[in-house]
């Protein structure tokens, strides 16, 4: 979504070619497949115990698997948080720079719509960090 928005701001005519629904569906499907593939090993690390005929699922792995779980979690943090955040950050910084650049032949401050767009960019980045970290 961020890449699509970035292309729309930086290269509006170019983004029309990549903004088609079929292309978006393919990208979304590929992302979901990647996420499911990356998260499947969590099922291997899950531990359960039985207390009073109730099965309890623990949020940590067995002791002997814990070092592997830490390594797996670190890779997943990099792949599923840091990489998307870097892409989002670069896209939104490029968009903000373009929006903050004064239009040719104008003087004075930024139009209200551009200020609101830059504020929205800051909010999106903040929400991403708060929700996914």
From Swiss-Prot:
Keywords of the record: Cell membrane, G-protein coupled receptor, Membrane, Receptor, Transducer, Transmembrane, Transmembrane helix
SUPFAM superfamilies according to UniProt: Family A G protein-coupled receptor-like
Entry GO CC: plasma membrane
Gene: P2RY2
Residues that span the membrane, as ranges: 27-47, 75-95, 117-133
One Pfam family this sequence matches: 7tm_1
InterPro entries: GPCR_Rhodpsn (IPR000276), GPCR_Rhodpsn_7TM (IPR017452), P2Y2_rcpt (IPR000356)
All ranges on the Extracellular side of the membrane: 48-74
Role summary: Receptor for ATP and UTP coupled to G-proteins that activate a phosphatidylinositol-calcium second messenger system.
Family (UniProt): Belongs to the G-protein coupled receptor 1 family.
Protein name, per record: P2Y purinoceptor 2
Example of a GO biological process term: positive regulation of mucus secretion
Membrane-related topology note: Multi-pass membrane protein
Annotated localization: Cell membrane
GO molecular-function terms, A-Z: A1 adenosine receptor binding; G protein-coupled purinergic nucleotide receptor activity; G protein-coupled UTP receptor activity
Domain of life from the UniProt record: Eukaryota
Main location: membrane
Record topology, Cytoplasmic segments: 1-26, 96-116
Record-linked Gene3D superfamilies: Rhodopsin 7-helix transmembrane proteins (1.20.1070.10)
